Regions:
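Accessory terminal helices/loops
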Residues: 49, 63-158
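General alpha-helical segment detector with a strong preference for membrane-spanning helices
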Residues: 38-39, 109
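Metallo-beta-lactamase
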Residues: 1-37, 60-65, 70-95
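Conserved beta-strand hairpin/beta-sheet module of binuclear metal-dependent hydrolase folds
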Residues: 41-63, 68
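Divalent metal-coordination and catalytic microenvironments
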Residues: 14, 32-35, 42, 101, ...
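Bulky hydrophobic/aromatic packing residues
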Residues: 25-27, 44, 50, 158
Length: 158
């Protein structure tokens, strides 16, 4: 995205696990390059009723239908990037998962349903199990797509 077709000014290039503070909130950058090179997920602490929870604004972790995983000459590390992202995300202790790419994936973590339940007790957004489940189903889907593409390539070489 280039507003008015002008390049963005870059203050600094963030590395994995570096922090950014905005409006008094500190966010931790996590490199999650599977879906898109340079994709970054953001971890932050949030408070509710005198408790602190860890939230994650996750970059997308799904595989788009047109993605070539097997023997991708344009992105030879795509499978390793996805696997890195899934493993790294699984290693985080997240209470509140939030959808990827700035809310453009409301289906992630059942966010649409949770939004309709705002105000309920317990808070529907506190969902560490849903966080891990979303990682697992996306990782499984990536593995199935990779195997499907591998088989198709091998069948074409016979």
């Amino acid at each position: 995205m280039r507003p008015d077709d002008k390049p963005h000014l870059i203050d600094r290039v963030l590395q994995d696990n570096e922090t950014v503070t905005l409006g008094g909130e500190t966010l931790i950058a996590h490199r999650t390059p599977g879906h898109t090179p340079g994709c970054t997920s953001w971890e932050l602490d949030v408070e509710e009723n005198d408790r602190t929870y860890t939230a994650l604004i996750n970059c997308s972790i799904g595989v788009n239908p047109d993605y070539q995983l097997y023997q991708n000459s344009d992105r030879p590390d795509i499978v390793a990037d996805y696997r890195y992202s899934y493993g790294m995300l699984r290693s985080l202790d997240i209470d509140i998962p939030l959808g990827g790419l700035g809310g453009s994936h409301p289906g992630m973590y059942n966010l649409t349903d949770k939004y309709e339940r705002i105000g309920e007790t317990p808070n529907p957004f506190i969902d560490p199990g849903g966080y891990l489940y979303e990682i697992a189903i996306n990782e499984q889907a990536m593995g199935l797509r990779l195997e499907e593409q591998r088989r198709a390539a091998e069948a074409g070489n016979r």
